[in-house]
């Protein structure tokens, strides 16, 4: 697995061991070992259908694992009593954003507030300032984006220690997405642990400190964002004549692009050795460039 974190690095809010979920013959999640650090923002990246939602639902007690184990704040996710305690300390905003359609926005805010003694009225007010939801409108008449905003308001305001968000920006316009991401950053700065799933790499790169990538039910990347990006480089070499791609295939080279006499390599670690190889092939110039999280995602997931 790429960039796996040492268990001695930090404390963890979430830990899983071989966590798996099978639906008939389909393995939705397979042998997941995932350690989510306590405190910062963690992004959970994967394509649609990769297993993100199933994983989060298992963590929050909405789906029972087929095998393996998991803990949140040291509490067993498969134990009914401990799962109740988990839901007191961690809030789950699911992808389907289920709400009571017959209520108005104001009614469901008031209704939800009554169940949570640690309700953050300051966050409620802050959220409504950024997203002036129509308080007298019934939920069934809200747009998809407004339903997402309302679900986030109800989750964020509960005063929990941790937010578990499944596709929290789904249905939002670019301005609203930016506002939500900035709000999540401010909550993390207060010490709240945030784990959110997304298939939008740019959102994860913008705010996440740690990233987990899942591909067809398997965890393929687990790392801090900075460490992961520092482990990759893009090398752009210009030759006097075209180069044979076979001469560029070597350990550490993850992707090769050739356009005439210009070669672009995506490399993982040990870039100096590969640079020396390019020089031995008589490269006229070699530029070393950073790699985006999107490129790393495509290398580990999308390119398969």
Feature map (PLM): residue ranges:
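Alpha-helix N-cap/helix-start and coil->helix boundary motif
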Residues: 20, 106, 201, 242, ...
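ABC transporter nucleotide-binding domain
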Residues: 179-269
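Conserved NTP-handling cores and scaffolds of large molecular machines
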Residues: 116, 232, 301-304
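Residues that line or immediately flank small-molecule/substrate-binding pockets and catalytic motifs
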Residues: 167, 239, 290
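ABC transporter nucleotide-binding domains
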Residues: 11-16, 21-196, 201-215, 221
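C-terminal coupling/interaction segments
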Residues: 2-7, 266-304
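Short loop/turn segments at beta->alpha junctions
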Residues: 104, 224, 289-292
């Amino acid at each position: 697995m790429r960039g796996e974190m040492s268990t001695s690095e930090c404390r963890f809010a979430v830990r899983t061991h071989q966590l798996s979920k099978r639906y008939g013959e389909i393995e939705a999640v397979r042998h997941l070992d995932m350690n989510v650090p306590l405190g910062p923002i963690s992004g959970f990246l994967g394509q649609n259908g990769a297993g993100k939602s199933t994983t989060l639902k298992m963590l929050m007690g909405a789906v029972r694992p087929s095998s393996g184990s998991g803990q949140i704040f040291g509490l067993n996710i498969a134990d009914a009593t401990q799962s109740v305690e988990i839901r007191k300390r961690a809030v789950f905003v699911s992808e389907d954003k289920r709400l009571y359609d017959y209520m108005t926005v104001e009614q469901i805010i008031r209704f939800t507030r009554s169940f949570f003694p640690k309700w953050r009225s300051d966050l409620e007010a802050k959220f409504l300032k950024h997203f002036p939801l129509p308080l007298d409108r019934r939920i069934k008449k809200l747009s998809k984006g407004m339903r997402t905003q309302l679900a986030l308001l109800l989750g964020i305001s509960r005063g929990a220690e941790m937010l578990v968000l499944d596709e929290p920006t789904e249905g939002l316009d670019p301005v609203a997405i930016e506002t939500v991401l900035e709000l999540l950053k401010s909550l993390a700065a207060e010490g709240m642990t945030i784990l959110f799933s997304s298939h939008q790499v740019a959102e994860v790169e913008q705010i996440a400190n740690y990233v987990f990538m899942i591909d067809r039910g398997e965890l393929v990347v687990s790392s801090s964002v900075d460490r992961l990006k520092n482990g990759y480089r893009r090398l752009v070499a210009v030759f006097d004549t075209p180069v044979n791609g076979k001469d560029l295939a070597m350990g550490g080279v993850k992707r090769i692009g050739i356009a005439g006499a210009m070669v672009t390599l995506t490399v993982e670690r040990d870039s100096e050795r590969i640079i020396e190889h390019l020089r031995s092939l008589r490269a006229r110039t070699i530029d070393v460039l950073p790699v985006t999280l999107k490129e790393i995602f495509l290398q580990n997931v999308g390119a398969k």
